């Protein structure tokens, strides 16, 4: 592992483990070795930290597909780059390079984590948005297990519109790991990509719905200004 990854892990893991109350279900479904794709729903800024915590619990390191803005933020760019994360330059000609890097990582037996929605969901009830094609493309090309994982509780900590606090409150976080999806490995046709992406969205929605009763959504209701 890169020294920067080990440094970040050494700082963040104890904090995450002691500050939040975790419920992890289905962890045994994550392979301990070999190329693996974990696909998470995205409801808050804390989600990558929660995903990394889950992966570390099974003794693996994680490579995230991360938006380029994180690599340009001087406060964290040195960590993101030094920890070997994969930059996604969305909307540019270089965007496909991210999948090439992820493909090589999977071929080398690494675990790659993705947020297939591409950004934090805009749904007011935090339902997953439609998955973009990246996760499906990787699974179809490499044959690596594509495993949907649902996050819940992080929306009470660092939600999309948080303004009042930078230090996160103590809260419960739950993660449900689903079953690896069956995909037609080697079929990289548009129909196959569309079908796998659709099924991934459906699986994430079902997993999230199963977690919702466990942790109340404590976000403040959005204020509607009078006309």
Range-by-range predicted roles:
Residues 20, 60, 171-173:
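Residue-level signal for beta-strand positions within conserved beta-sheet cores that form or flank
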Residues 2-20, 81:
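Short hydrophobic helices that act as membrane-entry/anchoring signals
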Residues 12, 82-89, 118-122:
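Short, basic, glycine/proline-bearing loop/turn elements
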């Amino acid at each position: 592992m890169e020294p920067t990854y080990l440094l970040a892990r050494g700082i963040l893991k104890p904090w995450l483990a002691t500050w939040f109350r975790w419920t992890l279900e289905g962890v045994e479904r994550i392979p301990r070795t070999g190329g693996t794709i974990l696909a998470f729903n995205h409801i808050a800024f804390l989600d990558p930290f929660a995903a990394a915590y889950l992966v570390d619990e099974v003794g693996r390191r994680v490579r995230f597909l991360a938006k380029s803005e994180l690599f340009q933020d001087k406060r964290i760019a040195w960590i993101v780059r030094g920890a070997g994360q994969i930059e996604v330059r969305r909307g540019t000609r270089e965007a496909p390079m991210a999948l090439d890097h992820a493909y090589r990582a999977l071929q080398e037996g690494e675990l790659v984590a993705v947020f297939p929605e591409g950004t934090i969901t805009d749904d007011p009830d935090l339902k997953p948005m439609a998955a973009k094609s990246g996760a499906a493309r990787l699974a179809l090309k490499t044959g690596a297990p594509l495993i949907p994982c649902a996050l819940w509780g992080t929306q009470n900590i660092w939600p999309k519109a948080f303004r009042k606090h930078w230090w996160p409150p103590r809260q419960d976080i739950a993660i449900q790991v689903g079953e690896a999806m069956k995909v037609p490995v080697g079929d990289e046709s548009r129909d196959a990509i569309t079908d796998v992406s659709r099924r991934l969205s459906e699986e994430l929605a079902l997993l999230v719905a199963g977690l919702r009763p466990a942790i109340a959504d404590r976000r403040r209701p959005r204020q509607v200004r009078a006309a």
